[in-house]
Amino acid sequence: GDSSSRAKALARAVADGRVLELSVYSPSMKRHVPVRVLVPADRSMPRPTLYLLNGAGGGEGTGHWFEQTDIVDFVADKNVNVVVPMRGAYSYYTDWLKVDPVLGRNKWTTFLTSELPPLIDRKLNTTGVNAIAGISMAGTSSLSLAEAAPQLYRAVASYSGCADTSTNLGRLAIRAVVEGRGGGDIANIWGPVGSPGWRAHDPVVNAYKLRGRAIYISTGTGVPGPHDQLQGQGIDGKTTIYIDQIAVGGAIEAATHQCTLNLDRRLKQLGIPATVDYA
């Protein structure tokens, strides 16, 4: 549906008491993080939890799950809690080595694996069974977080994310997001480019840590598809958006396609089953 129908779906869910707007203090980041939670209509039993991460904008603009997808309607009949942090733009949802002059203090691995889950488990009476998924920038993050805390997540999904961080292609993708869009300095993430921290956080290098998890990965090819037309959803005849979607979006999707091939190959070498969808 379009954004007005999505807004209505969200309003209905709010009215039904299915949406919780939390403000969660992060000791590691020394600030409050807004977290939007979708709970099932039937809360009589403990439920599993899906941690769903927004793309590059971190949910701070309109490019987030609630604005761009039918997530509210999609999970309405699923017996699952959905937890969406609404901050973290251009952070890659990782623990940064240094405070960035533009992007500030980012300790998202700590927040998402240590600080937030115990609070969610207590507040929502969960089963303690978790999954994590992310799109675009956060597709990389979801894989990395699942490797950082394998005992925490039963399943992981990455949509249009580049799994590499220590290859030229992976670094290019991170630079495009953090520096190109966020104005930050990528050396503040894991140290200077090429330093050991970059390999230590590379989901392809560390893919063996995903063993035993349910894994879903999807990517496009970067070739313009049926929605990439001037009248397509979210474009509405605006030429600059169209050019941006084809040139920038296409290039990013082509890069994530190659990254996904790399991850797919690595998982096969390791004998780790995964569902990989080349849309």
Predicted regions mapped to residue ranges:
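Non-catalytic cap/lid and distal C-terminal segments of serine-dependent acyl enzymes
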Residues: 1-279
